[in-house]
């Protein structure tokens, strides 16, 4: 049994990386002593009993301006608790994790939760990715594509990098799920932010609505673009077709109401919403964006991969599925083609092997 630290910016934030970190902490605690080290805390939450939790600072401060101060405090905790391995969750805390472990025997695993092709976070983020690639003992990417990008762009050697996806909680028996081929509803799940490509989604929706006004399209998720998107939907007279549902609780339980899932993102890490859709036997149509869709969707077998950001091609594929019930059923029946590698036991096996050998 090893003592494993999980370093995060804000463990109680509501993002995907934080959700993954919580699940990982609970599961890894079955074979290790887990210490969650949260630099900051946006809100107070009751923590699971499986792991130890510590907050470094009461108020959020700039990592860039306070790097030495923050790293020194983290290092003190690592030494006092004799941590063996430190998982650094996201590039944002790479500088802290690497500096805090310098001069210690703590092994570091940098866990990338975005991808190298996403340049929207700016040069500082790219620099932090470089820090992890250069100085961490092991780099873990979400996809094989990103693994290859790290090897090419940062010259990371094969023995220092692993591709370990996030797992998907499959509480359903696929045999028990009945696909509703009569449904006339499309679903998109994702934060209302620019990276999710809602500008293109609106273009697509306008084309599809002209041909199939008897269908509807629901967008599940909240975010900074809510008001802007609401206004544009009214402007394009799409209120009856396109619906902003906001954040939906127990989202995994409503997929079965829909005919298929659409994703228009510019970038992803590993889109869990697509995996959730497949677990619920939904066909998927997605732009072939970096990274994830091409590793989840078997093109022309359980969905369509569309040339990046080609709204007309996306609309054509959506209309094709709407007009072809047999195709929807065929895609639904093959929804599980790539699911096995995302099952919890498969992913945890990789994590436990990595931690035991490092």
Task: Give the role of each language-model region.
Residues 136-161, 168-170:
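A short, active-site helix/loop in glycosyltransferases that binds the activated sugar's phosphate group
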Residues 298-300, 304-311, 320-326, 340:
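Conserved acidic donor-binding segment of nucleotide-sugar-dependent glycosyltransferases
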